[in-house]
């Protein structure tokens, strides 16, 4: 039988997933990058109605620097299972994370709700991404967890002007990939976006890597 959205994005109040978060940020006015490591917990808090009037779930994110510390509230997200897709709203941007049918090489425009072409947008790099599945229903090891049925969503992998040489005036790199596990949800995410401009010899951008630690 073919998989449902619920199989790979189960939403129940009280469900949580904890991750190691490796956060890549620019430092020293953009001349370099550094990585900060945290733990984060995503907790399904309540069933709500989203801004389109559909049943959805509110998800709280908590963060701490290391396992001995108390969790601190950090962010709030909205997740909607439409029956044929799984939408996730983060910082007011609505992503179509999963879409039926779940099968290798099936492709969809996962960022189609995001306004990325207006004149002053800083989101141009999100324009026209083709998400597609691979390694459907395959086992995977994520962190220390062995997972028996996972799907990989490749969202983007492109670059311009890389590797950077002394002649490079502009460069850009985008990487985005997620793995979902059956009956758990997202277990891995790797995202990186940066731009380099020779005119001020600096980088802008950021990256995040989420790696599953634990879940209920």
Task: Locate the predicted segments by residue.
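Conserved functional acidic sites
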Residues: 1-216
């Amino acid at each position: 039988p073919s998989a449902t959205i619920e199989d790979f994005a189960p939403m129940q109040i009280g469900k949580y997933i904890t991750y190691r978060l490796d956060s890549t940020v620019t430092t020293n006015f953009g001349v370099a990058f550094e990585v900060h490591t945290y733990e984060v917990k995503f907790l399904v808090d309540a069933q709500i109605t989203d801004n389109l009037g559909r049943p959805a779930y509110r998800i709280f994110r908590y963060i701490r620097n290391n396992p001995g510390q108390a969790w601190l509230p950090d962010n709030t997200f909205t997740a909607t299972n439409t029956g044929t897709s799984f939408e996730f709203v983060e910082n007011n941007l609505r992503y179509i994370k999963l879409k039926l049918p779940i099968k290798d090489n099936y492709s969809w425009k996962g960022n189609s709700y995001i306004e990325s072409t207006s004149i002053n947008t800083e989101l141009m790099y999100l324009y026209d991404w083709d998400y597609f599945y691979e390694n459907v229903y395959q086992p995977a090891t994520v962190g220390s967890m062995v997972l028996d049925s996972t799907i990989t969503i490749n969202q983007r992998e492109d670059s311009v002007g890389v590797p950077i040489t002394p002649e490079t005036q502009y460069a850009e790199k985008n990487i985005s990939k997620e793995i979902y596990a059956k009956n758990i949800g997202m277990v891995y995410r790797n995202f990186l976006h940066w731009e380099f401009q020779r005119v001020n010899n600096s980088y802008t951008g950021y990256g995040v890597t989420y790696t599953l630690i634990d879940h209920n």
